[in-house]
């Protein structure tokens, strides 16, 4: 009879050595033959289930681009029609509008031609667009308005949040995920959309010469964007975030996606002036801000690809955004027009809101001019207008809906200067006061 030690027990089932056929010892633990058999059964069951279930596969996109037919491609607006639509929503920037109108028309005409090409015809390459201009001059609005006109998905990405693969931050493929979400998950629609990448100047490398250290949010991002801008089939994780080997991917072909990149490119004018031999901007006399802005625009109109290389963009990246449009800084007259002229002008929005309460809203010309002057001093373009007007109109929007005696409000220059509407000019109006619910 074999000798058993009654103190030795299986660490899993608790049976003693004499109750089992074999007890295997480890460093401080024991396992019996019965528990080993049970573990083997569990493993065999999982292996069997894994073999019978289909493995996760990427969502395939048909390779034949000729099948990507969209009825909207048959009705591409002409460049003059595109510019006319832009004029209704964006003030100024006439040259930039022309460049955008032609580029967008050619891009979607290129997509339309792919539906009918036989294979031996001239292939039209994609022309992405670079918008250069100060903050608040209308770069994002131009791209958004184009997408609205063409009825295509539109997504905005911030280049400053992007890093190359393997580092903390967003992968460039997450840009495509945003576009896919806007397209309600329809891959075919997303593949004809427009992506606006803002702050593209912030991913410029620090010097013209390649760095020996890794620039994961500058040159590294430019390298990561190259294939996407040119046209590739990208694997996009459906839930966003970082990729891992065992997740499913959605495949998106970027060959027909129009990329519009925008940035302020502060200091680029000095690079241009050094090349053409002009004296650096230096100091300008007080009271001449508009003259300085005009000199800045004139310098940027002489922009060449080499200037962008010296600024910090790599040549391969510049080659994939051949269309460059320089937007002008907004002067006081342009800011006044932005307040009053566009279809969705800010003052028109407030007038409509108060009209719903049966109140007529009037902004005196001097008040509008004062708002524009203050916005121009802030140097943030059209963005400053909303901040000033919302601060001014806060008390009006709070007080007027509850006042049955107010039928007409007049905003004067003094109210704008004091940032106070406590002394509203109240006049009789022909608008009926709506009954409260």
From Swiss-Prot:
Residues 50-74 are annotated as: Disordered. One of its GO terms (cellular component) is HslUV protease complex. ATP binds at residues 134-141. GO terms for biological process: cell division; proteolysis involved in protein catabolic process. InterPro entries: AAA+_ATPase (IPR003593), ATP-dep_Clp_protease_ClpX (IPR050052), ATPase_AAA_core (IPR003959), Clp_ATPase_C (IPR019489), Clp_protease_ATP-bd_su_ClpX (IPR004487), ClpX_bact (IPR046425), P-loop_NTPase (IPR027417), Znf_CppX_C4 (IPR010603). Zn(2+) binds at residues 10, 13, 32, 35. One of its GO terms (molecular function) is ATP binding. Keywords: ATP-binding, Chaperone, Metal-binding, Nucleotide-binding, Zinc. Residues 1-51 form the ClpX-type ZB domain. It comes from the Bacteria. Component of the ClpX-ClpP complex. Forms a hexameric ring that, in the presence of ATP, binds to fourteen ClpP subunits assembled into a disk-like structure with a central cavity, resembling the structure of eukaryotic proteasomes. ATP-dependent specificity component of the Clp protease. It directs the protease to specific substrates. Can perform chaperone functions in the absence of ClpP. Belongs to the ClpX chaperone family. PANTHER family: ATP-DEPENDENT CLP PROTEASE ATP-BINDING SUBUNIT CLPX-LIKE, MITOCHONDRIAL, ATP-DEPENDENT CLP PROTEASE ATP-BINDING SUBUNIT CLPX-LIKE, MITOCHONDRIAL-RELATED. This is ATP-dependent Clp protease ATP-binding subunit ClpX. The gene is clpX.
